[in-house]
């Protein structure tokens, strides 16, 4: 049960981190396109 709890927290942290990266890519994509935006297929204008 305790192990499952830690796995849940880890998954949430991972999702939040990805979300923050995505937002950063969208906002700053025009100035400095990051490698992660290319990997996820986000078009950089």
Swiss-Prot record:
Residues 1-17 form the signal peptide. It is found in: Cell outer membrane. Its main location: membrane. One of its GO terms (biological process) is cytolysis. A lipid is attached at residue 18 (N-palmitoyl cysteine). A lipid is attached at residue 18 (S-diacylglycerol cysteine). It is a lipid-anchor. Keywords: Cell outer membrane, Lipoprotein, Membrane, Palmitate, Plasmid, Signal. Lysis proteins are required for both colicin release and partial cell lysis. This is Lysis protein for colicin E1.
């Amino acid at each position: 049960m305790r192990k499952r709890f830690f796995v849940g927290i880890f998954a949430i942290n991972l999702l939040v981190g990805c979300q923050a990266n995505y937002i950063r890519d969208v906002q700053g994509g025009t100035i400095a396109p990051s490698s992660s935006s290319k990997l996820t297929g986000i078009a950089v204008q």
